[in-house]
Structure formats: C-alpha cells, structure tokens
Amino acid sequence: MKGFLSLTLLPLLVAASPVAVNSIHNDAAPILSSMTSKDIPDSYIVVFKKHVDPSSASAHQSWLQEVHTAHTGRMELKKRSLFGFDFEAFMGLKHTFHIAGSLLGYAGHFHEDVIEQIRRHPDVDYIEKDSEVRTMSEGSVEKNAPWGLARISHRESLSFGNFNKYLYAEEGGEGVDAYVIDTGANVKHVDFEGRANWGKTIPQGDADEDGNGHGTHCSGTIAGKKFGVAKKANVYAVKVLRSNGSGTMSDVVKGVEWAAEAHIKKSKKGDKKFKGSVANMSLGGGSSRTLDLAVNAAVDAGIHFAVAAGNDNADACNYSPAAAEKAITVGASTLADERAYFSNYGKCTDIFAPGLNILSTWVGSDHATNTISGTSMASPHIAGLLAYYVSLAPAKDSAYAVADVTPKQLKAALISVATEGTLTDIPSDTPNLLAWNGGGSANYTKILADGGYKAHNAETTVEDRIGIIIDSAEKAFHKELGAIYSEIKDAVSV
C-alpha cells in the first residue's frame, strides 16, 4: 500500500529514504511519515531524546495530559458557542514505551495543535505518524506434508526420498521461550502439547484469542510437535494485530516492549532450566524508525529476533521491521529452491527459509491445520531454528555449562552454517543463503565447527530441479511397484 499524510500547512521534505520528514522550525522535532504504508489519522508515536530518563518522561507525560485536556476543553466551548461547529474527540495518551532501557516514548491520538506543542518540547527527539501494519502471508491451500522442515535439515535440494523427512535433535527448543508477536495463538491446539501460553493482548478491547489464524500458524512452525522446528519450545502469544490481520505500528511497538520485559523478568529469576528467548514478527508496514529501534532494543535485552522480509517483491530495507539491523530478516524460498515470487530481497535480507505452501496449525478447532504462503511462513522457521540452537547449549547446572550465546553471536553462527548458493532468482545484492539446522546433530559446537556449505547444484535451473524431483518420484514409484509385484509372485508360487 502506498500513501502518506502530511500536515497541510507544512512543507514536505522527501529524502531518498522511504520516510518523509515534515518540519517548519529548525528547533522543532521532525514528524516522520512512511511512504510505503497507510498512516492512521491523528495518531502519533513520540520518541524522547537519549538524555531523557523515566522520571523526566513521566513529568513530560503529565504535562501532555494537561495540554490535551485544556485543548479538549477549548474545543468543547467552541462547539457550544458556534452553531454547526463539530470536532473529533481525541483519545489522548494510548501507550508509553520503555524498552530495555533504550527506547523511551509514548503513542496517542492528538489534535494537530497539541502535536505542535509536543514538537517544540525540548525532550522530544522525533514524532512518527502511526501507521498500519499487516501480516506477511499470501493465501493458498494445499494439503501436503511440511516440506519446509525437511528442507532446513538437508543440504542438497529435496528429492522424493527425503521430501518429508525432518532430521532433528529431540531436545530442540527445550528451555526456550518463543514470543510470537502477531494475531495471537490457538493455545489449546493439540500440536502445542500444553506448551503454548497467552501472553498479552495489546489492541484495546480485543479478545484473548486468535480470530485470524496467522499467529497460530507461525507458532506451529516454531514449536509444534508435528509442524515445528523446535518441538519442545514454549510459545507466548503477544497479540498486536486484530482478526483482520492488521493493526497499528504503536501497538506493535508496545508488543515488542512486553516481550522484552517478560524476557528480562524471566532471566532475572535464575531458573537453571531457562536457556533464553526468541521472538518472531511475521508482520510489517512502511519504514518506521521507532519499530526498528524497538526491535534493536529487544535484541540488546537478549532476545533472538526473527522478522519477515515482506511480500512486495521489493527491497526489504524500505519496510519495518525488516530493516531492523540487529534482527534476522528472512526471505521466502520454494520447494524448487528459488526465491518465492513475492519475497522481498536486498542487503537487509539476511537469510532465506521455506515460505511457499507451508502446512501448520490453525484456528477453528484444537486439531485444525492450514497451508499458506508468505515471508510470514519463512520467518518462524528461523525463529524456531534460533530456539533450536539456543536449546542445544549445555544446561546451566551442567558441568559443561557455558556463557549464554548472544543474539549477535547466534545471528553470525546461523549465517555461517547456512547452505550457500543453492537458490535461484536471487538479486546480486542479496545473500544467497538457505537456513540449515545441523542435519539432526545435537552438538552445537560441532555444527559451528563444520561451518557452511556451498551447494553442488548452485548452477542448475528451477526446471532442472523440478525434473530431478519428478524423476526421483518415478524411480521410487517403480521400485515400490516392483516390490509389490515380487510379493504377489511369491504368494502365487506358494
């Protein structure tokens, strides 16, 4: 979606980046507006300067409430005195943010006169127009096995013999919490085996349930018994999108804050069975400096973060949270080892994972499944893989215990062991890397020591690979048919 709103009396300065900046005074905080998503009228995210501490932020917010209340009162008086005059009621303060001691700010619904006063406050760094975010899935249905799991556990392209064979360490995901920041999750689904929990509902007035299915699907790919990469991880649903699959940038930032705080609280408990936290965000909108900073702050707090690259077949750097430098930005690949036709690309894309026709958990019943596509489906493969690798570290009460692997270290490790050069239709400025789980090994140190792998079939075409799969299927079919014929022949002979 294209579009942006600017204040009608302000000149618009458009930089080379996909963010428009509005400003009329050199000493006033700029108003940022994405040019690749739809702004929400009169809704803003305000970010403080680095020197502002929580106490000063609280004082500022008290001042803001006074300004907002006074303005509302003036508008009420004007409404009574002028026949036919009407004005929209503004909600005022909606969220406050303080993420891992790094990002400090708030969001709300304000009249432009109030925003002008906020802009001139010396504590304000910038203001961002709140905007729409949406899930990153593409609709399609196909009832087949989760080939994506098989693909990340094999180096070479899949054949009929290993098409649905997932090689993995049974303890994968144990002791790891996965925060799925999405539409919620069907926590009673049997595939979660009781490991799924409702974390937090951010949109005001929304129910504690997944009325969409998208978040449940992502959760299943991360940690489901049948459909998951890390089959023993715990899932925490953080609902930031409504049942229609869309929401606001400010709600998403608040969801990131909740996950970061939950992780920090869990880390401080000293539970020796707890190994770490991962997060997945299979959603996105236009470029948002605030959301990117929020994700980076959560990573600094210790969360291993995977985000979808986006489904616009465009440069991922123009979208958030895909542009968050400390997260792992994931593009989508197909069964034929090509970049999915919708997948974003570019230098902000770190790695690829299966994202076309992915089968996973769904809503409607505790056994429901669905097959959908998108970078939304690729990202949870990586979130699950992060949980998988984190869990392979020795337990904290073990004689072999080591220091926790940091998000920066694990991101580098994930990239270093990936399968290189196997994908087609990859632009020159995009890493040609496909995720790998170690081929079933439970030895994290050995997986790292073995390092990456350059695919032997890097130069084959998509048509060649499809042909290989079909040939393998035909050979397997004839082999099976021959075995059945032999059994019948032996039975007749007897």
From Swiss-Prot:
GO terms for biological process: proteolysis. Glycans are attached at N244, N280, N443. One of its GO terms (molecular function) is IgE binding. Its EC number is 3.4.21.-. Serine protease. It comes from the Eukaryota. It holds the Pfam family Peptidase_S8. Residues 180-198, 209-231 are annotated as: IgE-binding. The keyword Transferase does not apply. Residues 146-448 form the Peptidase S8 domain. Residues 1-16 form the signal peptide. It comes from Penicillium rubens. Residues 43-136 form the Inhibitor I9 domain. Residues 17-136, 454-494 form a propeptide. The record marks N311 as: Important for catalytic activity. Keywords: Allergen, Glycoprotein, Hydrolase, IgE-binding protein, Protease, Serine protease, Signal, Zymogen. Belongs to the peptidase S8 family. This is Subtilisin-like serine protease Pen ch 18.0101. Disulfide bonds: none annotated. The active site is at D182 (charge relay system), H214 (charge relay system), S376 (charge relay system). PROSITE patterns: SUBTILASE (PS51892), SUBTILASE_HIS (PS00137), SUBTILASE_SER (PS00138). Gene3D superfamilies: Peptidase S8 propeptide/proteinase inhibitor I9, Peptidase S8/S53 domain.
